[in-house]
């Protein structure tokens, strides 16, 4: 043997193969992309290969501003792309009156549905491909980068949400004021025109808001989310919901402020949350007739409220009743309303624990041991027989009471106070989440801690302060959101409604918030909602369910103009996704994962702040 060769390391063919495979795959990808680009240039550019043509083939009505809400004009359609256009392989911009396009909450199509139980305010999505638009939702004229957090809690640019109507209608209640080129949010509301602090102080005198035992809150009829904004001072996370109605921009204002919110209504279907999700539910003059339909809406609140959770109500008949009492006057109508309300609460076995102007507070029981005898005597409502109280995607509300855990299991379902709650999940211990274990939960938590550290180290996305509103399109156990908890962000954790096991209950047990969703449809939110979109395995999940083009166009609709996207998936899937994002004018780059950190897959990063 040559002495010069005897100290050379022995090469392992297997290691060489593993080392060079990622480079070979990426080289092949770029070669194919180049060939594809050349092919596109030689074809009819009206039709991007292997993709549905971005086209608009029929008229559609959508209001542009609040001034023309009553009679929206026909949508202005773009002319067909010219064959000589060098950009015709790109998706076209939608017309300008698409700036606030809500595919599943469109006022013109809603008119064909019944007003009974506000059904027309429910989700009504385009159900066939011909009714979906293949265009990019434009930003409003004069759009500016939103104020950074926490400044955004108080200010929003008028051009970003160009609706004066709410400021005019609610100017005496201090919801929002228009001052020059910006909106100012002074913290008022219908029940607290003098400011939300004094209002919350009344609740604080009864409930332990600062103890960590109350972490997740549902605010029904949220206005501009001033209540939820103030509760952040106590590290309480509030899901603020309201329908798209005459105050059409209230949820949009909340999101522009950097607060968790989505379009939602108590109507026909269950709210898209699991049972036992919220520590407190709040209604301040939320315009819900709680005693209608034999108390059906309160039964739905009971479903999503945790054992020993609180229901806080202000406004008629509560506030008015106290006011009349102070003035030594009485109102028969209001008294009757309150008696009906108390009757529903007796049937639900709730306990009134405080009545202090302007609120009344009830508490849900920890179990139904004492309640079962009463329910049997009353005969209505009974306990629900449904085997899955967490099923809530397009499921009609049920006139029954969701059973609570057996008294012997009560200790197993008790939540820790925040922030210990983040890593303590009772549903895992009770075995209600099939296919998951405590060990698996811990491994998932650690994996996402490493992944988020990798994101921040390599891409500088998280620590630069640019991102406030975040959505995780396939949240799993909420590991991504949990890893972000140290950053000034909030995360909407989405769990696909048909995914097994159903993990959204785990997300809420951790003190996080989220919703069920079908990504073949549009999300119940306004355009330009999120600064950062995270999609882990989403496209693999939906490849055989619907066209991924529509999912990507929905992501474009809800992403802010200078926002970012992180897509993690199989390499072959991301090649298809990347071809589409190129046509969306997104600046995307693919990265192989570091196998020493991650198990498999590829990352596609889109950063639209880079021009």
UniProtKB/Swiss-Prot annotation:
EC number(s) from the headed UniProt entry: 2.1.1.-
GO BP terms, alphabetized: methylation
Transmembrane segments: 16-36
Membrane topology, record value: Single-pass type II membrane protein
Cellular-component GO terms for this entry: endoplasmic reticulum membrane
Pfam family membership, one: Methyltransf_29
Regions of this protein lying in the Lumenal compartment: 37-611
A GO MF term: methyltransferase activity
Predominant cellular place of this UniProt entry's protein: endoplasmic reticulum
Cytoplasmic topological segments: 1-15
Cell location: Endoplasmic reticulum membrane
Keyword terms, alphabetized: Endoplasmic reticulum, Glycoprotein, Membrane, Methyltransferase, Signal-anchor, Transferase, Transmembrane, Transmembrane helix
Glycosylation-annotated residues: 68, 97, 289, 408, 411, 587
Protein family (similarity comment): Belongs to the methyltransferase superfamily.
Protein name: Probable methyltransferase PMT19
């Amino acid at each position: 043997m040559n002495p010069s060769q005897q100290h050379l390391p022995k090469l392992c063919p297997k290691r060489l193969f593993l080392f060079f495979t990622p480079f070979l795959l990426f080289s092949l990808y770029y070669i194919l992309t180049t060939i594809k680009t050349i092919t596109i240039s030689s074809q009819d550019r009206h039709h991007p290969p292997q993709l549905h043509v971005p086209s608009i083939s029929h008229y559609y009505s959508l209001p542009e501003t609040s001034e023309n809400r009553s009679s929206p004009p026909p949508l202005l359609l773009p002319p067909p792309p010219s064959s000589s256009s060098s950009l015709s392989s790109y998706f076209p911009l939608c017309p300008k009156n698409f700036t606030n396009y809500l595919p599943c909450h469109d006022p013109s199509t809603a008119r064909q549905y019944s007003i009974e139980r506000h059904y027309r305010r429910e989700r009504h999505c385009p159900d066939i491909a011909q009714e979906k638009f293949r265009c990019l939702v434009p930003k409003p004229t004069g759009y500016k980068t939103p104020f950074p957090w926490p400044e955004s809690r108080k200010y929003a640019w008028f051009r970003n949400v160009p609706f004066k109507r709410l400021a005019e209608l609610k100017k005496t209640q201090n919801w929002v004021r228009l001052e020059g080129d910006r909106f100012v949010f002074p913290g008022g509301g219908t029940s607290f025109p003098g400011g939300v602090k004094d209002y919350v102080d009344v609740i604080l005198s009864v409930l332990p808001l600062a103890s960590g035992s109350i972490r997740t809150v549902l605010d029904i009829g949220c206005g501009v989310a001033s209540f939820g904004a103030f509760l952040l001072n106590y590290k309480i996370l509030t899901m603020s919901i309201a329908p798209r109605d005459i105050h059409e921009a209230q949820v949009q204002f909340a999101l522009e402020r950097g607060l968790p919110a989505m379009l939602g209504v108590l109507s026909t279907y269950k709210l898209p949350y699991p049972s036992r999700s919220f520590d407190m539910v709040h209604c301040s003059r939320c315009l819900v007739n709680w005693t209608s339909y034999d108390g059906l809406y309160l039964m739905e609140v009971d479903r999503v409220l945790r054992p020993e959770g609180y229901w806080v109500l202000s406004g008629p008949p509560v506030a008015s009743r106290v006011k009349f009492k102070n003035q030594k006057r009485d109102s028969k109508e209001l008294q009757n309303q309150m008696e009906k309300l108390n009757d529903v609460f007796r049937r639900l076995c709730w306990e009134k624990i405080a009545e202090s102007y302007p609120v009344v507070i009830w508490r849900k029981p920890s179990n139904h041991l004492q309640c079962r005898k009463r329910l049997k005597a009353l005969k209505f409502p009974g306990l629900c027989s449904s085997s899955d109280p967490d099923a809530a995607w397009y499921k009609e509300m049920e006139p029954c009471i969701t059973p609570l855990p057996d008294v012997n299991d009560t200790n197993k379902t008790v939540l820790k106070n925040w922030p210990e709650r983040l890593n303590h999940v009772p549903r895992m211990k009770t075995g209600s989440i099939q296919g998951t274990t405590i060990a698996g939960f811990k491994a998932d938590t650690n994996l996402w801690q490493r992944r988020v550290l990798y994101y921040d180290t390599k891409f500088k996305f998280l620590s630069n302060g640019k991102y406030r509103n975040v959505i995780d399109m396939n949240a799993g156990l909420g590991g991504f959101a949990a890893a972000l908890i140290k950053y000034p962000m909030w995360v909407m954790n989405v769990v696909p409604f048909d995914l097994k096991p159903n993990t959204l209950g785990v997300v809420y047990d951790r003190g996080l918030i989220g919703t069920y969703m079908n990504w073949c449809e549009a999300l119940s939110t306004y355009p330009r909602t999120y600064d950062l979109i995270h999609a882990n395995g989403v496209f693999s999940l939906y490849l055989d369910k619907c066209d991924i083009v529509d999912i990507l166009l929905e992501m474009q609709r809800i992403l802010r103009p200078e926002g970012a996207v992180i897509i993690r998936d199989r390499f072959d899937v991301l090649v298809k996704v990347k071809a589409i994002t190129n046509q969306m004018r997104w600046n995307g780059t693919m990265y192989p994962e570091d196998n020493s950190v991650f198990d498999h897959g590829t990352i596609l990063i889109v950063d639209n702040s880079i021009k």
